[in-house]
Amino acid sequence: MGRAKKVVLAYSGGVDTSVCIPYLKHEWGVEEVITLAADLGQGDELEPIRKKALDAGAAQSLIADGTESFIADYAFPAIQANALYENRYPLSTALARPLIAKLLVEAAEIHGADAVAHGCTGKGNDQVRFDVSITALNPDIKVLAPAREWGMSREETIAYGEKYGVQSPVKKSSPYSIDRNLLGRSVEAGPLEDPWVEPLEEVYDLTKAIADTPDQPEYVDIDFAQGLPTQLNGQALSPVALVEQLNQIVGNHGVGRIDMVENRLVGIKSREIYEAPALLVLIQAHRELESLALTADVTHYKRGIEETYSQLVYNGLWFSPLKDALDAFIQQTQKQVTGTVRVKLFKGAATVVGRQSPHSLYTPDLATYGAEDAFDHKAAEGFIYVWGLPTRVWSQQQR
């Protein structure tokens, strides 16, 4: 008896997911494999991917357009949370996984499948993100992960696929593992596995080399409404269009590159290259707007929430009670986060040079050192005495 009768497989067109099709059928006794490729704005032509799945033995090959939901329902809430894993990575790849899991479960329920499958190995984060998200959405559905169990090397995997007509797309001149969506790219493997080796320029695609960027700065005005990006340079745009345009503008100035060694959930360190031009600038601008609109205590407390939020998303817990609770807190904080932020882009740097908000708590006549100063300086002495009283008492006790 096979492990499942009908399976919906998350499909990318790569070696592992292509080999999963015959492997599920011939090794695990699956009667019918339906593939699902998610369009998340990665820019690939998906029709060849559909054909490749059918040629590899899939009974059906589905394509789900999730781009709008990806930006509006996943990326924009992460911007409100200023989500940066380990204070650097804006989760451009991690944010896609819960949506793909959701699309898989929906397809399985529509087509009457008793299992879903993915091509993740046992070494990365994505296996956790998929398995946990799928289980959270439908605890009764089976999750199959052939690449986690088959024990084949890369060469053996390719050879197995060729036996069933699966052609390898890997070129010897491109040793990298690349994942891409509308938010950005992640690149790993090959020469990048040595953290001392500087990435070649060929690694990057969305951002220009500094030598090729314009010799004049460019200014971008980004409007937010309750923490959500709404306009670019005074033009109202849909979430997808805003990210698309901002990616082009920001990447043209060489902004948006990350080279980091991160701590994976499975306990190993991994050297990753990320490009996320628009997402990084949107988080930077959003955080600056919060500095105007939020009180000091909310701002400081939210920083801890942001770190927990980022870890949850990175660790595959998008669909979890704690994530829901954090969402409620974050949404409460965003009610007054409305305004405009001006960002200067020049030679690989994005610098916030202006911010304004109708809900700004910045009071010029209290902040100024000029003649308009309305701050009561005499009140400072009593405040300092009370504020420092515990320290004074402690110091006296030590004598």
Swiss-Prot record:
One of its GO terms (cellular component) is cytoplasm. L-aspartate binds at residues 121, 125-126. Pathway: Amino-acid biosynthesis; L-arginine biosynthesis; L-arginine from L-ornithine and carbamoyl phosphate: step 2/3. GO terms for biological process: argininosuccinate metabolic process; L-arginine biosynthetic process; urea cycle. CDD domains: ASS. Its EC number is 6.3.4.5. It catalyses: L-citrulline + L-aspartate + ATP = 2-(N(omega)-L-arginino)succinate + AMP + diphosphate + H(+). One of its GO terms (molecular function) is ATP binding. It is found in: Cytoplasm. The keyword Cytoplasm applies. Homotetramer. HAMAP family: Arg_succ_synth_type1. NCBIfam families: argG (TIGR00032), PRK00509.1 (NF001770). This is Argininosuccinate synthase.
